A protein has these predicted regions:
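Short phosphate-engaging motifs
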Residues: 3, 61-65, 140
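Residue-level signal for secondary-structure boundary elements
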Residues: 78, 152, 156-160, 234, ...
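Generic alpha-helical structural element
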Residues: 54-58, 88, 92, 133, ...
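RecA-like P-loop NTPase motor core
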Residues: 9-125
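Sensor-1/coupling segment of RecA-like P-loop NTPase cores
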Residues: 1-8
Length: 261
């Protein structure tokens, strides 16, 4: 096998014949993954049964949006459908600062180069260190709060969508459950500032609670955001960067990079 791997690495011409019992025929575009599969009489499903690419995120909110992003990509890009199952979103919350520290630590390079770090959109991608930032250029909750405010102020057709209407997500729902609470929170921040009290971390905590208390509603908001042409560049940027990292990480898990072409 090592000789085959060496030949493929050097891009030497290699003819591999598939034994089909009654006949033999050449394998098209032979690579080490296909050859191993046939030598061991395995199917593609067998080979990838226990193989995953770990995705580390900051929190549950990021994983929620990542699930919706993956669902969107599967419906939009046929080639993504076959690889989405290979990504494993690790159920652990790690701050952006700590994640960045781990993935940029040269001593841990051998470990981190086998995983992908997904930071919130208020950070920047660092492909060299296997870090990609979510689309939106802000934390997930902030992206959605800003977007729903925009839909409200512009009287967007979103509010007349039959699914939204049937779910009871009217403008009154937004005003009562989100807009008024945001207004009260902003007033509280002003009070803290006047009294010289710290407001550190309060906005993020407030946004997270608001998101989780209205998660079903914000799911529809994000789906609308995904289909808004204004956001296409950001959505495509994340897709392309994730693709680049997949190509870099896949071989470490014996996953054929050609699965996503």
């Amino acid at each position: 096998m090592s000789l085959l791997e060496e030949m493929l690495a050097k891009k030497d011409n290699l003819l591999y014949l598939i034994d089909n019992i009654t006949s033999a025929f050449p394998m098209e575009d032979p690579d080490i993954y296909k050859i191993k599969m046939h030598l061991q009489s395995l199917t593609q499903e067998d080979i990838y049964e226990d193989k995953i690419i770990p995705l580390f995120t900051e929190d549950d909110e990021a994983r929620c949006l990542l699930d919706l992003l993956f669902d969107y990509y599967q419906k939009t890009y046929v080639e993504f459908g076959s690889v989405s199952r290979l990504f494993h979103k690790v159920l652990i919350n790690i701050s952006a600062e700590n994640l960045t520290g781990i993935f940029t630590d040269s001593k841990l390079l051998h470990t981190t180069m086998r995983s992908i770090c997904v930071l919130d959109g208020d950070h920047k991608s660092d492909i060299t260190n296997f870090i990609v930032a979510l689309p939106g250029k802000a934390a997930p909750e902030a992206v959605l709060l800003n977007y729903i405010k925009e839909l409200y102020n512009n009287d967007d057709p979103f509010w007349k969508n039959r699914i939204i209407v049937d779910k009871g997500y009217s403008k009154n729902y937004y005003i009562t459950n989100i807009k008024n609470l945001v207004g009260d929170f902003e007033a509280e921040l002003v009070r803290l500032h006047k009294n010289g009290e710290s407001s550190k971390g309060k906005r993020r905590a407030f946004n997270k609670k608001l998101f989780n208390d209205n998660q079903n509603f914000f799911t529809f908001v994000f789906k609308h955001w995904l289909h808004n042409k204004v956001n296409k560049a950001e959505i495509d940027r994340f897709y392309n960067e994730l693709h680049t990292l997949f190509l870099k990480v896949a071989p470490y898990h014996e996953i054929n990079p050609k699965e996503w072409t």
